[in-house]
């Protein structure tokens, strides 16, 4: 720490302030840990996703084969894929439980309205990550689920038809749909989620945790 302090003056005070920041006594229960557990699942998703990206091939011809290779041939591949799969399921559940806790305790009220909005965006991003990742194995179930998702998007007023074409890569389902979902899943959506997470935690830090009901 001294070495860092010499090169970045003040970093020691920042680290000490973060480490020694008092936590209200009413937050010392599992219901106030749901947000942190959601973040933990997101970190697991990122780490296991990087490992899976080493072997995954986002083409219609090779996608399913590469997933099978990860599961059956790569050392610990089945474990890593299972961790990615189940941490996704758990993250979605925890996001909903976290938002229910925030709503029940009134933590979304003034002056924390913007943090609630950021949390709503994070919920949408979590669902979008789950949806885009579902197509990547490119099996029958995931393929038709994605087609249904595109048709559902088509029902949106004004932007629906355009959004469907953007998702599918054309009037009909094309190979570009897989590559677009892959880019969304591994690059765009995680980057946007990280931005909202940083904003979310900064607002928590500045505004503090809400008082008990």
UniProtKB/Swiss-Prot annotation:
Q: Does the keyword Iron apply?
A: yes
Among Pfam families, the record links this protein to:
Cytochrome_B
Q: Where in the cell is it found?
A: Cell membrane
The family database entries (InterPro entries) matched by this protein are listed as:
Cyt_b/b6_N (IPR005797), Cyt_B6_PetB (IPR023530), Cytb/b6-like_sf (IPR027387), Cytochrome_b_N_euk/bac (IPR048259), Di-haem_cyt_TM (IPR016174)
Q: Which GO terms describe its molecular function?
A: electron transporter, transferring electrons within cytochrome b6/f complex of photosystem II activity; metal ion binding; oxidoreductase activity
| Similarity field | Belongs to the cytochrome b family. PetB subfamily.
Quaternary assembly: The subunits of the cytochrome bc complex are a Rieske Fe-S protein (PetC), cytochrome b6 (PetB), subunit IV (PetD), and a diheme cytochrome c (PetX).
- What is this protein's record name? Cytochrome b6
Species this protein is from: Heliomicrobium gestii
Question: Which gene codes for it?
Answer: petB
């Amino acid at each position: 720490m001294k070495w860092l302090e010499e090169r970045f003056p003040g970093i020691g005070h920042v680290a000490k302030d973060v480490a020694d920041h008092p936590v209200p006594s009413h937050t010392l229960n599992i219901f106030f840990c749901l947000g942190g557990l959601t973040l933990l699942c997101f970190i697991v998703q990122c780490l296991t996703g990087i490992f899976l990206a080493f072997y995954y091939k986002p083409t219609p011809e090779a996608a399913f084969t590469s997933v099978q290779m990860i599961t059956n041939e790569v050392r610990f591949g089945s474990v890593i894929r299972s961790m990615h799969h189940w941490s996704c399921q758990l993250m979605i559940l925890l996001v909903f439980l976290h938002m229910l806790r925030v709503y029940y305790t009134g933590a979304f009220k003034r002056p924390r309205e913007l943090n609630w909005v950021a949390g709503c965006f994070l919920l949408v991003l979590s669902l979008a990550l789950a949806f885009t990742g579902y197509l990547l194995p490119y099996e029958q179930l995931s393929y038709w689920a994605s087609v249904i998702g595109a048709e559902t998007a088509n029902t949106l007023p004004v932007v629906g038809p355009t959004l469907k074409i953007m998702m599918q890569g054309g009037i009909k389902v094309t190979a570009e749909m897989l590559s677009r979902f892959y880019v969304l899943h591994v690059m765009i959506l995680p980057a946007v989620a990280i931005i909202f997470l940083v904003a979310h935690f900064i607002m928590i830090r500045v505004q503090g945790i809400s008082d008990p009901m």
